[in-house]
């Protein structure tokens, strides 16, 4: 008996070409889930091909999540690749910029908040709308951080964005629980990934 069986489920995982996002995408596929691997470059296509060569049901999609119209079109395309149905969204995409607080460029602040927080909300909203249209339960997993709860050094935008993700998750969870949409966040500690 499999304790974790997602056969027939369909998921979108952002930030899925490397690091934690890639590991989560692979874990979902190992449990039987069909996954759209979303990355910021064409590497998403080669990662999807690699997963397909292992026998997984996987699609790749290159989407610049910093561009609002592109991420909305990308979400629609991902749902289409999944046959018009979605069960799970994993918001794993994130970027990092490091500067001392007194020197932190506002352009870097905007870039980090756009990808880490605004895109996460936008994708949650689109997933929520999709779940409601389908009249089916849905799962959203946001990737927060230990920096959601304490500051850190030279990472004010990242800390602010991940604090926002933690609170956004609570707000969505409160509002959508009655619609059978479960919204949770995972707050990993420091990980030795390419981003860090």
Regions found by a protein language model. Name each.
Residues 145:
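Residue(s) in the substrate-gating loop at a strand-loop-helix junction
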Residues 102, 150-156, 178-179:
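Active-site loop immediately N-terminal to the catalytic Tyr-X3-Lys motif
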